[in-house]
Amino acid sequence: MLARVWVRGLAATKKKPQVLVKDGPSLQDFISSASVAEAVEKYEGKLKLEKGDRRLRLPPWLKKEKILPSENENVSRLKKQLKHLKLATVCQEARCPNLGECWGGSDDSLATATIMLMGDTCTRGCKFCSVKTARAPPPLDPMEPENTSTAVASWGVEYIVLTSVDRDDLPDGGADHLRKTVQLMKLKKPELLIECLLPDFAGDKISVEKMATSGLDVYAHNIETVERLTPWVRDPRAKYRQSLDALRYAKEVSPKLITKTSIMLGLGEAEDEIKQCLADLRASNVDVVTFGQYMQPTKRHLLVKEWVTPEKFDQWAEYSKKLGFLYVASGPLVRSSYKAGEFYLKNVLRNRQN
């Protein structure tokens, strides 16, 4: 599955007041220091991995207070509901650093989580991802589209993000299964805005078209990293140009779709390579891009090559906006569907409908 560590979406049962924002999340959302500059200035550790180093020490701007299920009723309730419905979440499977914040919610935001469809086992083994892998995962649950749509409709959410594992063992990569889920959600709640973080479907245009015309509102597929690093970071079946083609074709068959992608920083990419990647994305008519820091999920995964400073994330946000992206979210702990982005995209989509 592509970029499972970059997702978010799905509000919990109890509504709370919403705050609509025009820009991405502030860096103050991610650090506890009085100022970003102070946190960076006081850090005495290395920012780049050097020869002979085992790993980099975690800098202060990446440290977050974890919210345990016992500490927040929203976390506990959502976990029980998802388990009862046999629904997987990428928040748990991919060890997302924002799980406690999003599942727990706050006074000015909804508790959120991301539903991961087609099981919790992927046919691909990307070197940055902690989701389980197998050549032949269990068969699809035929009741999953119905269960998922029923659950989401009962939660009363306005904006939902769905993601999935890769299923190269299926002829269509699972496109029919995912399409059915989206269509049932729209049937049960027509006003629901749906974002899907999708696989590349092994480059199959028919599967891409099935999803682009399914009724979803945001077609997301993550490029993950620059072209040079793609063979090293992603599963060999996940190709850089193949990802660009999927995003481009989705826009071609459904021009009103918002297309979206995400880039991890800190894997050894050069600035010129990031700029080329952004140029490739704009040439493919991608509307939204997010940047986040790669963080090693376990010792078996790729080492972090560089801690990218918050200031640098701000610079990439400004650079991307000048290229014409509709929306940019950039920060150390930003993931591809960070909730501030969801609220922003919700307003964009509503305005387009009116």
UniProtKB/Swiss-Prot annotation:
Record's cofactor remark: Binds 2 [4Fe-4S] clusters per subunit. One cluster is coordinated with 3 cysteines and an exchangeable S-adenosyl-L-methionine.
General remark: This protein may be expected to contain an N-terminal transit peptide but none has been predicted.
Protein's UniProt keywords contain Mitochondrion: yes
Catalysed conversion reaction: [[Fe-S] cluster scaffold protein carrying a second [4Fe-4S](2+) cluster] + N(6)-octanoyl-L-lysyl-[protein] + 2 oxidized [2Fe-2S]-[ferredoxin] + 2 S-adenosyl-L-methionine + 4 H(+) = [[Fe-S] cluster scaffold protein] + N(6)-[(R)-dihydrolipoyl]-L-lysyl-[protein] + 4 Fe(3+) + 2 hydrogen sulfide + 2 5'-deoxyadenosine + 2 L-methionine + 2 reduced [2Fe-2S]-[ferredoxin]
Positions that bind [4Fe-4S] cluster 1: C91, C96, C102, S337
Subcellular location: Mitochondrion
Binding-site residues, [4Fe-4S] cluster 2: C122, C126, C129
Gene Ontology CC annotations of this record: mitochondrion
Descriptive protein name: Lipoyl synthase, mitochondrial
Matching Pfam families: LIAS_N, Radical_SAM
GO molecular function: 4 iron, 4 sulfur cluster binding; lipoate synthase activity; metal ion binding
InterPro entries: Aldolase_TIM (IPR013785), Elp3/MiaA/NifB-like_rSAM (IPR006638), LIAS_N (IPR031691), Lipoyl_synth (IPR003698), rSAM (IPR007197)
UniProt EC number: 2.8.1.8
Gene name for this UniProt entry: lias-1
Family recorded in the similarity comment: Belongs to the radical SAM superfamily. Lipoyl synthase family.
Needed co-factor(s): [4Fe-4S] cluster
Any one GO BP annotation for this protein: lipoate biosynthetic process
Gene3D superfamilies, A to Z: Aldolase class I (3.20.20.70)
Keyword set, alphabetical order: 4Fe-4S, Iron, Iron-sulfur, Metal-binding, Mitochondrion, S-adenosyl-L-methionine, Transferase
Protein's UniProt keywords contain Hydrolase: no
